[in-house]
């Protein structure tokens, strides 16, 4: 993931792609937390960006679940 994925970019993704992004972001967050705990993390702002990306993905998934927003088929 780039430094802070935009919601508009995420809205273009399908459900499976969104789940893949979520798994990727969670794995990155785990690695960043591990680096922070061992004192190896240089960019602490990245932790915040990844957490916000995860929140954006969960928000979009919930919107789709409630029918607020649907997947735009390309």
Swiss-Prot record:
Gene3D superfamilies associated with the record: 1.10.287.310
CDD domains per record: Ribosomal_L29_HIP
Single biological process term from Gene Ontology: translation
Keyword vocabulary terms for this entry: Ribonucleoprotein, Ribosomal protein
PROSITE patterns xrefs: RIBOSOMAL_L29 (PS00579)
MF GO annotations: structural constituent of ribosome
Gene Ontology CC: cytosolic large ribosomal subunit
PANTHER family per the UniProt record, alphabetical: 60S RIBOSOMAL PROTEIN L35/50S RIBOSOMAL PROTEIN L29, LARGE RIBOSOMAL SUBUNIT PROTEIN UL29C
Entry similarity comment: Belongs to the universal ribosomal protein uL29 family.
Name of protein: Large ribosomal subunit protein uL29
Species of origin: Streptomyces avermitilis (strain ATCC 31267 / DSM 46492 / JCM 5070 / NBRC 14893 / NCIMB 12804 / NRRL 8165 / MA-4680)
Gene name for this UniProt entry: rpmC
């Amino acid at each position: 993931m780039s430094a802070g994925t935009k919601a508009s970019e995420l809205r273009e993704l399908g459900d499976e792609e969104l789940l893949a992004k979520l798994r990727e972001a969670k794995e990155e967050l785990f690695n960043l937390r591990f680096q922070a705990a061992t004192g190896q993390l240089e960019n602490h702002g990245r932790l915040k960006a990844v957490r916000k990306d995860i929140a954006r993905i969960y928000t979009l998934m919930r919107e789709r679940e409630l029918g607020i927003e649907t997947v735009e088929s390309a």
